[in-house]
A protein has these predicted regions:
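Chalcogenol-based redox active-site neighborhoods
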Residues: 1-240
Length: 240
């Protein structure tokens, strides 16, 4: 496939936040899947990596695998993808478990599915091929998909940069909290910190907030209001 063709696919087929997740069927290291239908009712992190048997990708898979239970507690499932074949995936994951130690992690078994995409069809559908980086490898893309199959977050990393997995977990918690409590989260928010109250929908409500008449709400000005939500309230709201 030429670079011009890949560029055209990316330009016309790039999914966006708020779009339904493009559907596909695939062969994976955990059997065949129908996506996103098989994951209805769960949050999903669908992520791509450039290639098997590469060091940055190895560190990422070990980290994701070590955090899989933490994501499961948030009703979130992990699905990986690269344009390598199934047998390459299997051999790489076996090598990770048997030979690789990274930080305090060793004997790491990757149990979540890793998609075979040797035709690049899925990677193209999700805009994971960036010709400016590499026309034959997927970049480090992350798609957060909600229980209704809608894309809620998209993050891209260049080939040389490993992902921040604590941030990905923070994104999941923040999205679930925003949905459950009808709020927004400020910069660098963590559970237990104050949250953003949606802007007032009327002049009257704005005035009441500024005057401190809305219980639990503190306003710096009419458009910038916060309220306290404890860490316990956050996790109760999202069902953890």
């Amino acid at each position: 496939m030429s670079t011009d063709t890949v560029t055209e696919v990316v330009a016309t087929g790039m999914p966006r936040i708020g779009d339904p997740a493009p559907d596909f069927t695939a062969v994976t290291t955990q059997g065949d899947i129908n996506f996103p239908g098989d994951y209805e009712g769960s949050w999903v992190i669908l992520f791509s990596h450039p290639a098997d048997f590469t060091p940055v990708c190895t560190s990422e898979f070990m980290t994701f695998a070590s955090m899989e239970d933490e994501f499961a507690e948030l009703n979130t499932k992990l699905v990986g993808l690269s344009i390598d074949g199934l047998y390459s995936h299997i051999a790489w994951l076996r090598t990770i478990k048997e030979k690789i130690t990274f930080r305090d992690m060793q004997n790491v078994e990757v149990k979540f599915p890793l998609i075979e995409d040797i035709t690049m069809e899925i990677a193209q559908k999700y805009g994971m091929i960036m010709p400016g980086e590499d026309s034959t490898k997927a970049v480090r893309a992350v798609f957060v998909i909600d229980p209704k199959g809608m894309i809620r977050t998209i993050i891209y990393y260049p080939l040389s940069l490993g992902r921040n997995f604590d941030e990905l977990k923070r994104v999941i918690v923040a999205l679930q909290t925003a949905d459950a409590l009808s709020i927004a989260t400020p910069a660098d928010w963590r559970p237990g910190e104050r949250v953003i109250v949606p802007p007032a929908g009327s002049c009257g409500t704005a005035q009441e907030r500024v005057e401190g008449k809305e219980d639990g709400v503190t306003c710096e000005d009419w458009f910038f209001c916060t309220k306290e939500v404890t860490e316990e309230e956050v996790y109760a709201a999202i069902g953890k």
